[in-house]
Amino acid sequence: MRGSVIGAERSGQTIMVALVLMVGSFYTGSLFGTNQPIYVSHPSSHSASSKFANKIELTYRRLPLVIPESGMNVCPLEFNEYIPCHNVTYVHQLLPSLNLSRREDLERHCPPLEHRLFCLVPPPNDYKIPIRWPTSRDYVWRSNVNHTHLAQVKGGQNWVHEQGQFWWFPGGGTHFKHGAAEYIQRLGNMMTNETGDLRSAGVVQVLDVGCGVASFAAYLLPLGIQTISFAPKDGHENQIQFALERGIGAMISAVATKQLPYPAASFEMVHCSRCRVDWHTNDGILLKEVHRLLRPNGFFVYSSPPAYRKDKEYPMIWDKLVNLTSAMCWKLISRKVQTAIWIKEEKEVCLKQKAELKLISLCDVEDVLKPSWKVPLKDCVQISGQTEERPSSLAERLSAYPATLRKIGISEDEYTSDTVFWREQVNHYWRLMNVNETEVRNVMDMNAFIGGFAAAMNSYPVWVMNIVPATMNDTLSGIFERGLNGAFHDWCEAFSTYPRTYDLVHSDHVFSHYNKSYGDGCLLEDIMLEMDRIVRPQGFVIIRDEEYIISRIRGLAPKFLWEVETHELENKDKKITESVLFCRKRFWAII
């Protein structure tokens, strides 16, 4: 077991761990402040340090659930990158039962309750508070993502380079090693017949498949284009961890056997640059998932060898892609350099004709209405049925009432009231957190409802992952219609992200929703543990909920090594105030 021990006693197999507050702000007026932890390396050395009683012990989830008086146990240091539902060791045990030809091994596989870890995930050795945005777009601390594989195999394509104590991201990629900005301009020209850019082509929201370190998304931001970037946890180890450390919206995911956790008709563009997806296989079922996600007149951008190479099996793959896209009534609008671009023309008559010719099957209406959470991929094509034009800019989308909300009974007055409420609350949040706005970049709203919190945060230099629990009504379609991004998720399970991802996690009545309703894996302590895993050291957790839940969390927070304050803020009815918890994760380490 690595780590020094404070105190001389050892009891049985329990080893006491030194947990030290890393005091002082990383930024003291300059980019690279002190950011140095205070280590205790000898039992008699207690100066300027804080000792905790938490024990280092590999602990699994058990019933009844009991948190020791000494506080939550701390997982051993080797679990510093633990992702419960993407655990390579557990997935390896499942391999005989998985469809490897369709890469089911890359999807989420959450362990049963008794195999879940129930201990705090520690930071790695020499972890530092992340560099602030926008500098983090180009530089992150090497010790925070201490993996060299990508730099070794992708350095020549300008993904990432090592520079002393930093990782440097030049903005390149496999198909844009000379820079994402030039590549993005080229795509805009291809979409507009050399007359405009992605904005004039109507692109506001993008899904980047197999995103690498997310440089493509980073360079779309100046255009006001919002991107969800995803990639699996595969041989390109830690690519999503790099993206999130940079402050770019990303998550772990894979196109394999299940629908992606996003609503239908959510994106104007789906992008694949050497994304390692075999779109041409299995009767194009993966392309049909792209069709589901694209809005009418949305674009599929494909930068990959079959689009330009004439050797090996690439011409055969290209012919299959052409046949599959034609059957879905897509139109190939440009093919040059190393990229092909299709447009999804929403021609209902065409789709019905293709169905009559047995070239495709059309999805049932109820398939369109289901939340996309653990839903098997459908070998059918959805007709979106959309008739209303979306505003052309992000600013307009943020304020316009989404028509999809009317379908689920949310009126325009309720929408306006929610927007005003969260604008006021976000102002209070910043005042009470009392930090520079650049200290918060990655934000998650665990129960986003219709996106009012994220819309209010839009004036700050942050991005927000809006989560709509899969057990609630599908309001995520309305969130996407507002120009915001998000995903479906079930908080009985861990989220598909690395530890230490978010600077701020916002929870509005998440605990009361899951309280005693969804099984033992969704207890208050389970959700708190997942919050702790995904929030960064010195990051914030803001919790609004029923008073009895607030009281319980207030009592448990110190055992999770959270500082906690209670503030009274106006509730949604604006008739009374409610207690809101402001928790801050301490910066501690195993020594």
UniProtKB/Swiss-Prot annotation:
UniProt main location, coarse: endoplasmic reticulum
Sites where a glycan is attached: 87, 99, 146, 193, 323, 436, 473, 515
Record's signal peptide: none
Ranges facing Lumenal side: 35-591
One example of a Gene Ontology biological process annotation: methylation
Domain of life: Eukaryota
Membrane topology: Single-pass type II membrane protein
Spans within the Cytoplasmic topological domain: 1-13
An example Gene Ontology molecular-function term: methyltransferase activity
Compartment annotation: Endoplasmic reticulum membrane
Transmembrane regions listed in the UniProt entry: 14-34
Keywords: Endoplasmic reticulum, Glycoprotein, Membrane, Methyltransferase, Signal-anchor, Transferase, Transmembrane, Transmembrane helix
GO CC terms, sorted: endoplasmic reticulum membrane
UniProt-listed Enzyme Commission number(s): 2.1.1.-
Family: Belongs to the methyltransferase superfamily.
Protein name, per record: Probable methyltransferase PMT6
Organism name: Arabidopsis thaliana (Mouse-ear cress)
Phylogenetic placement of the source organism: Eukaryota, Viridiplantae, Streptophyta, Embryophyta, Tracheophyta
